[in-house]
Amino acid sequence: MFTTSLRQAQRIVVFTGAGMSTESGVPDFRSSRGLCKGNNPEALASLQAMNDNREAFVDFYRRRMEQLQHVQPHKGYDVLATWEQQLSVTAIITQNTDGLHERAGNQRVLPLHGSIQKLYCIQCGQHYDVDRYMNNQPSCSCGGFIRPSVVLFGEPLDSNILALAEQHSIEADVFIVLGSSLVVSPANLFPRIAKEHGAKLIIVNHDSTPLDTIADYVVNDKPIGSFLVETNRALQK
């Protein structure tokens, strides 16, 4: 049983994808066409859109931020916060930009794609909260443009966060995937790296993934929140 592996582990790494967020009511990014007024969301969440179509760019992210104001982290996030304190969770690598991990009190989050909950000026670097976009004020006092602190299409991932995620994956005894299809590179390399370095690999996802065949445990029949709550309950026995 994987609960034994969790109890014995010295380093547990958690990897979360869109499925973790959708259980809290966050629309999957690629299903958020209602925000885009007929445009492809990937086209609006791009470096080109930020440079050439700022009105639509700001409108897209403002609507996304409005959605997140009505969302609360589900109980699975609380379990991860508990595991950070009571088990040896060394990192939570996430593909999500919604900030739900941080809102739930998760401390060791590595956001591969940044956070929509943070803004900064591209000219002077001044940081702002989301109120600037909510109030449709995307201009800094210096005159620069204020953007979300997310990785846009056309931009590279943060090399420092990638390096940390890789190191934690190498050192993991147990690597848990929660709600990721594991098809997006380079993020999908981390569970493979962990497995190659001896970690137990647990995959919890609604659908099958390309790495199911190398996983030690695969769970397709439970919501992520329920899986985490039930696993935590079993660990208390």
From Swiss-Prot:
SUPFAM superfamilies: DHS-like NAD/FAD-binding domain
Substrates-to-products reaction catalysed: N(6)-acetyl-L-lysyl-[protein] + NAD(+) + H2O = 2''-O-acetyl-ADP-D-ribose + nicotinamide + L-lysyl-[protein]
Species whose genome carries this gene: Shouchella clausii (strain KSM-K16) (Alkalihalobacillus clausii)
Name of this protein: NAD-dependent protein deacetylase
GO CC terms: cytoplasm
Keywords: Cytoplasm, Metal-binding, NAD, Transferase, Zinc
Active site: H113 (proton acceptor)
Pfam families the UniProt entry points to: SIR2 (PF02146)
